[in-house]
Amino acid sequence: MKKILFCIWFTCILCQAYSQSCSFPWENGPLQVSENSRYLQHTNGTPFFWLGDTGWLLPERLNRDEAEYYLEQCKQAGFNVVQVQTINGVPAMNFYGQSSMPDGFDFSNINRPGIYGYWDHMDFIIDAAARRGIYIGMVCIWGGLVKSGKMNVEEAKAYGTFLANRYKDRPNIIWMIGGDIYGNIKTEVWNMLANTIKSIDKSHLMTFHPFGRTLSAEWFNDAPWLDFNMFQSGHRRYGQSKDDKKTLLPQGTEEDNWRYAEHSLAQRPLRPVIDGEPSYEAIPQGLHDPKEGFWKDNDVRRYAYWSVFAGSFGHTYGHSSIMQFLKPGVNPAYGATKLWYEALKDPGFNQMQYLKKLILAFPFFERVADQSCIAGDNGTKYERLIATRGNDYMLVYNYTGRPMQIDLNKIHGKTKKAWWYSPRNAELSYIGEFSSKVETFQPEGGHLNGNDWVLILTDGPRKYVEALQ
């Protein structure tokens, strides 16, 4: 415990120096949807690759020093978005014993002189994130609270007015309506909340966080307040859905999160899409029963690369201990045993940055998902290969290290250079130069789950991989 306290203190010193010397992403302008409606960018055209961590209970469970430490570790690991539950109760209570709603949905006297209130702490967290170039994805209120009647339409209008006026001028806000709920439950409340915020805050993007194995486009693709779609591929493994007819995909495809991206990008109007809640590292398969086994770092890598290569504009990672901020004195959920600050050392948390590094090394807006790059069998379940390409580059994700036949004619250039890229440590190894035809590739390590690699192919003269070296 003494070690973690020292780290928190040292982090606070570092962040002061960092905030004085760093350039921030919003200096490129606010976020907006790209011209091709597939990605996010800043208003000056700079690409934005969303790499999110799930910090659901950050506002409720961490004190100021702990919040600073956590956000610094997120920055160091390459995350540029943290998703939080703005309130997880009506009212919610934070580390300091302060209520989010001392007067219910009347926020006229929320700023009480001499009291470091709930929203003062929220301000602190948002500003601490901003000092590190991190956006806060604010789930305004968790869906179960609305479902149980804790906020009606008029209260949603009052709450949305309060939130929008308080945070419209912060540069690092992304609004998230919903919160693990079907969009056809209390739809009138969600529309009121979203439209109220948007009527006041016209600068920040907005989405809807849906229930597991569903997609926001099912209910809101035509909604004027929705800027991009989000799906929750959820925490179940193949065969665990039990014929749930409310889910978007059929039983037996539960882990195929790439299918949600494909489905969303086929909708019109076309909107960018992201997996806002895939299986978390160290959470039980199926979510609730530890006896079912736990998801590991290789699993969270698979979800990330499958989704992004299938067309998602970014990805959100999660860890069971981190999202609930498990620490001494807190009752664990979902079979968690590791403390949150120890979980920051886990491999999945630290490997996500290699995906962002990879995608940003290549021309961003021309990238498309293209399974025709695979000349052989696409594969099913864990054997599924996922290909994405630009005009003169191609990336193919292979989760099992199996042989694969790739059509090099799908990108420009008479000759192609090839590399293996490791999602585990970002190591790059040159394979060789090839003519434009179908070639067979297989990485080292054998054919087994978790021996995952990205095959990189470029037009011979291109120097894109220099950014990865």
Model-based region annotation:
Residues 51, 432-434:
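Short hydrophobic alpha-helix segments
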Residues 176-178, 207-210, 230, 274-277, ...:
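Short beta-strand segments
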Residues 24, 33, 166-168, 199, ...:
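Generic structural signal for beta-strand residues in well-ordered domains
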Residues 22-240, 245, 251, 255-256:
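Active-site mouth of glycoside hydrolases
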Residues 223-238, 242-326:
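Catalytic-core region of carbohydrate-active enzymes that cleave or remodel glycosidic bonds
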